[in-house]
Amino acid sequence: MSPPSAKSMEEGRTPSVQYGYGDPKTLEGEIEEHTATKRGLSSRQLQLLAIGGCIGTGLFVGTSTVLTQTGPAPLLMSYIVMASIVWFVMNVLGEMTTYLPIRGVSVPYLIGRFTEPSIGFASGYNYWYSFAMLLASEVTASGLIIEYWNPPVSVGLWIAIVLVVILALNVFAVEWYGESEFWFAGLKILAIIGLIILGVVLFFGGGPNHDRLGFRYWQDPGAFNPYLVPGDTGKFLGFWTALIKSGFSFIFSPELITTAAGEVEAPRRNIPKATKRFIYRVFTFYILGSLVIGVTVAYNDPTLEAGVESGGSGAGASPFVVAIQNAGIGGLNHVVNAAILISAWSSGNAWCYAGSRTLYSLAGEGQAPKIFTRTNRTGVPYVAVLATWTIGLLSFLNLSSSGQTVFYWFTNITTVGGFINWVLIGIAYLRFRKALQFHGMLDMLPFKTPLQPYGTYYVMFIISILTLTNGYAVFFPGRFTASDFLVSYIVFAIFLALYAGHKIWYRTPWLTKVSEVDIFTGKDEIDRLCENDMERQPRNWLERVWWWIF
């Protein structure tokens, strides 16, 4: 029996727009009405967009906190585990997005479409808020990184400059954003590759002092720094803490490809390509980077501990810089600080893009004011960009010490919010697979990834436990504070309030029936768009190498 058509599918179900979620067909209609986004992102831009958002201050600086608290072994182990989780999250998003890379698509749109409207609503605002706060976080980091050079003007001026540049790159044509992010990300990749090579040189004693490090610091002071309690229990808690904290380095990076799907050329060719190559780069940069950090800096290094305790965000708190200084290499710390600045600036650029497209998608679904669907003549949803960028002004809170405390709350909330959304992505993917199986279409997927659905079960299990235990340390004797408890768990209240409020108001079902999950609307349009898409063949060896990389 042949699968039902999109028309017959819609005739046999209740339109989801009655719940305020917005039918996929409505999404397309609203976007067309206000000038659609343009497919202006190339394959090379899409690939570096994702990895560029992933390589941020978490890798260059955030690793210092994990190293000092837990030791080099938990740092490496946690990055391996988190990279495997990101691989599966990226794969399931790649499958769903390649199947339906429609205009205005976003991760919460897919979640709501394949689960039920209230989950999509809560997820959507969780995503938008998190992206906007991450923008503010990276802008703040940029200002503090510049402070490393002790400029004669206030950090507030640098924050303003960074914000204005990010707005300019996002409010004009998407090609501007894509090209700027391509070069930003390229510089970050060169920086991390250079630091990894430098680490290998220091490992074998190639520095100015010719001190062969080897695995010295894994023996003294040791591979593990017991956390909270001594012995093996403390070592395990160190690993678990490292796993929780490493989430900030990876969070939301898989979603960037889905966010850009509606604006990329030849989506069914370029999205799978970006998905496959993204994870290779993550494994290379993050795992090798964490290994280099662990062998070149001791977890009890006084300079590193001082940088972490001072709350620095620039080169002074970077384990890479500490390793360079210990090796007696002069001047290179300024180069690394410039690389960290580019990293933070680029990540802020990516989060502004992701937040604006998420808000744009919410408005197209009827979940946000219609004004956010407005686009300019180049296809950029400028109202959504301005709304997301405005949240970035919270970065000025860091001009006061009390503001830094409040801002610390916001940035921690985004990490937990990201964990919650990864669990929801898993649920949406399982529902997507069941709907395809129901209609006998599972083998018709244009892009299939290995180890599914078992990889999704693995992600949901690990991330659920991480989410529930992310604030476990506050329950140890003498460590409980109301602020730390709220930082760890208030995101649950926010998410549940959004979810329950929408469900009570619209009386949505607990889950859309598998037989009614819409896997058809928009598919015919994408099939027509991609049916004549033929990949160009390289004309010479230079093109062959270039296309192999990008």
From Swiss-Prot:
Protein origin, superkingdom: Eukaryota
GO biological process entries: amino acid transmembrane transport
Regulation: induction: By L-proline.
A Gene Ontology molecular function term of the record: amino acid transmembrane transporter activity
Keywords, in A-Z order: Amino-acid transport, Membrane, Transmembrane, Transmembrane helix, Transport
Spans within the Extracellular topological domain: 69-72, 148-152, 205-236, 299-321, 400-406, 479-484
Membrane-crossing residue ranges in chain numbering: 48-68, 73-93, 127-147, 153-173, 184-204, 237-257, 278-298, 322-342, 379-399, 407-427, 458-478, 485-505
Stretches for region Disordered: 1-24
Mode of membrane association: Multi-pass membrane protein
Membrane-side (Cytoplasmic) residue stretches: 1-47, 94-126, 174-183, 258-277, 343-378, 428-457, 506-550
Name of one Pfam family that matches: AA_permease
UniProt family annotation: Belongs to the amino acid-polyamine-organocation (APC) superfamily. YAT (TC 2.A.3.10) family.
Role, per record: Required for high-affinity proline transport.
UniProt protein name: Proline-specific permease
